[in-house]
């Protein structure tokens, strides 16, 4: 009986699977990821609500706004 109880407890403990993307919060319209550090292929855009960095791939980074030169 104790082996059956131990087996059921082990199944309950090992059967709990956390959600896969719970750590990776999204930002920048779902294209960026909130992280502590950005990878080499990413750039920092702004801060996420939890004060982590919003990392966006260089391929998805919007082009810079051109500056008007006054002559």
Curated annotation (Swiss-Prot):
The keyword Signal applies. Transmembrane segments: none annotated. It comes from the Eukaryota. Disulfide bonds join 27-54, 34-48, 38-55. It is found in: Secreted. Residues 1-22 form the signal peptide. InterPro entries: Beta_defensin_dom. Pfam families: Defensin_beta_2. GO terms for biological process: defense response to bacterium; innate immune response. Its main location: secreted. GO terms for cellular component: extracellular region. Keywords: Antibiotic, Antimicrobial, Defensin, Disulfide bond, Secreted, Signal. Belongs to the beta-defensin family. PANTHER family: BETA-DEFENSIN 124. Has antibacterial activity. This is Beta-defensin 124. It comes from Pan troglodytes. The gene is DEFB124.
